[in-house]
Amino acid sequence: MNPESFAAGERRVSPAYVRQGCEARRAHEHLIRLLLEQGKCPEDGWDESTLELFLHELAVMDSNNFLGNCGVGEREGRVASALVARRHYRFIHGIGRSGDISAVQPKAAGSSLLNKITNSLVLNVIKLAGVHSVASCFVVPMATGMSLTLCFLTLRHKRPKAKYIIWPRIDQKSCFKSMVTAGFEPVVIENVLEGDELRTDLKAVEAKIQELGPEHILCLHSTTACFAPRVPDRLEELAVICANYDIPHVVNNAYGLQSSKCMHLIQQGARVGRIDAFVQSLDKNFMVPVGGAIIAGFNEPFIQDISKMYPGRASASPSLDVLITLLSLGCSGYRKLLKERKEMFVYLSTQLKKLAEAHNERLLQTPHNPISLAMTLKTIDGHHDKAVTQLGSMLFTRQVSGARAVPLGNVQTVSGHTFRGFMSHADNYPCAYLNAAAAIGMKMQDVDLFIKRLDKCLNIVRKEQTRASVVSGADRNKAEDADIEEMALKLDDVLGDVGQGPAL
């Protein structure tokens, strides 16, 4: 309602009441105006009424919501189901144009504004999380793997002779396939074991660059957040190597935005060396549905080149989800979530260590991994190879999701490349182990339930192993008795034959 509408309302309802309602609306509009002027995430989160007012105001700016609109094109924002329209707050046109995912759509001013505001808020939050010198970013409606592929395809035009991507090994399929899908050959650099941790082999990286030739290498593809006992790559050292050899550097920061340590590594890497782009998942860092990622970097023209590489328009759903989430939380709400995640990591580490010791296991020492933990399974794996896999299945059927039981000796072929010791990030890690991670949104009751159910599962597995050992021992005893009996019978036969020798 505009001032004229309020004035008209005063003729029907007491002016004092109408003015009070007008002031209340102005409070909502003030928050919206500040957002549009500053382009920053508000310190305090909005309530739902402000959010819905803002989204409604944006939606009515799109041509499909114009009163009396006559559409005669092939894409006019028509929706058959009213439920689908409500699900998307009537934002039907998506974002971008055929030549650029960040471009403005003439038919969809509201959706275009939503896209611009979302990208601005996300940039603000990346700075809040620790990468203060980030220059540009945009939300792309693809998960991390395909977003990495988009980065590699953009680099293809800048390095036409390149055919290889240097990649310190991490046993996760999508990041490997992202390189293959882009048409490049991943050069896998095995990690080195330092204590319990698997760390970047810097000498091997540099040796491979010299062997292949820098001009034949598209980029170095490094990783921050990962499953223990692997830890984030040595980003500062890798960034220096990339700067020295003039090789682009793309960082897979899938769920690292929630970790101040991972973000500090990226900030420092960009300060001392070269980082061209870093990619993070929306669902892993902002607790929204799967399907979106943020591509960010320190050189605005290069990030714009990546956005122009995206063919066609794109879904606005991931942008809408993260916009609603950030406006609901505000900076203070998101900072609180980051703080709670750190506290949960310490709590999970303490509880898992106690449980490990109670079962004659130990928590692997991985101080450079700020999110994931690992507990040895030596006492289980020593009895039976399948016991580790069985433990993982038991946890899943008892509604424990996210835990990974990693046996020794797994062999997996991904896009033609065979990984030995798959899931453990190394050909021959010393022991089987169980992973658990303290990611954003985890609560204390999640940790308590996990520890309780893991304890029960470990006890069940051990009882079954003990029973199997007893049965196996009994079978061996029976077999030995049968062998003795058989030998006795044969001896009797021999003696009988001797006693029945021919008469003289």
Curated annotation (Swiss-Prot):
Pathway: Aminoacyl-tRNA biosynthesis; selenocysteinyl-tRNA(Sec) biosynthesis; selenocysteinyl-tRNA(Sec) from L-seryl-tRNA(Sec) (archaeal/eukaryal route): step 2/2. Substrate binds at residues 97-98, 105, 313. GO terms for biological process: conversion of seryl-tRNAsec to selenocys-tRNAsec; selenocysteine incorporation. It is found in: Cytoplasm. TRNA binds at residues 271, 398, 463. One of its GO terms (cellular component) is nucleus. Pfam families: SepSecS (PF05889). Its EC number is 2.9.1.2. The modification Phosphoserine is found at residue 14. It catalyses: O-phospho-L-seryl-tRNA(Sec) + selenophosphate + H2O = L-selenocysteinyl-tRNA(Sec) + 2 phosphate. Residues 96-106 are annotated as: Phosphate loop (P-loop). The record marks 74 as: May act as a substrate filter by repelling compounds with a negatively charged alpha-carboxylate. Changing residue 105 to E: 50% of wild-type activity. The modification N6-(pyridoxal phosphate)lysine is found at residue 284. Gene3D superfamilies: Type I PLP-dependent aspartate aminotransferase-like (Major domain). Signal peptide: none annotated. Pyridoxal 5'-phosphate binds at residue 75. Residues 1-44 are annotated as: Tetramerization. Its cofactor is pyridoxal 5'-phosphate. Homotetramer formed by a catalytic dimer and a non-catalytic dimer serving as a binding platform that orients tRNASec for catalysis. Each tetramer binds the CCA ends of two tRNAs which point to the active sites of the catalytic dimer. PANTHER family: O-PHOSPHOSERYL-TRNA(SEC) SELENIUM TRANSFERASE (PTHR12944:SF2), SOLUBLE LIVER ANTIGEN/LIVER PANCREAS ANTIGEN (PTHR12944). Belongs to the SepSecS family. Converts O-phosphoseryl-tRNA(Sec) to selenocysteinyl-tRNA(Sec) required for selenoprotein biosynthesis. This is O-phosphoseryl-tRNA(Sec) selenium transferase. It comes from Mus musculus. The lineage of its organism: Eukaryota, Metazoa, Chordata, Craniata, Vertebrata.
